[in-house]
């Protein structure tokens, strides 16, 4: 992970409701952090890899997502893709009245770093 991205993530975490994050580098290597006991490192890395693959496969349909959000009963999974091929997946608790705009703003900042 580059120093700029490491500093970016460390200065903004943990956010309210953040269960985990995973940063995937263009070479496929990953860094992650969990703020809960119910997400294992393997779950975090494999989920982030699958989501990045799903978003990447949309490119073949001429769809170019910058951010994607999957909503499940207990989690929202946010994915941001950077032009350099790196991605950030955020695992956020799916709480009522949670300020999800804050999460989207973080992803926009990640893309711009």
Identify the role of each PLM range.
Residues 1-25, 29-113:
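Non-catalytic interaction/Regulatory regions outside core domains
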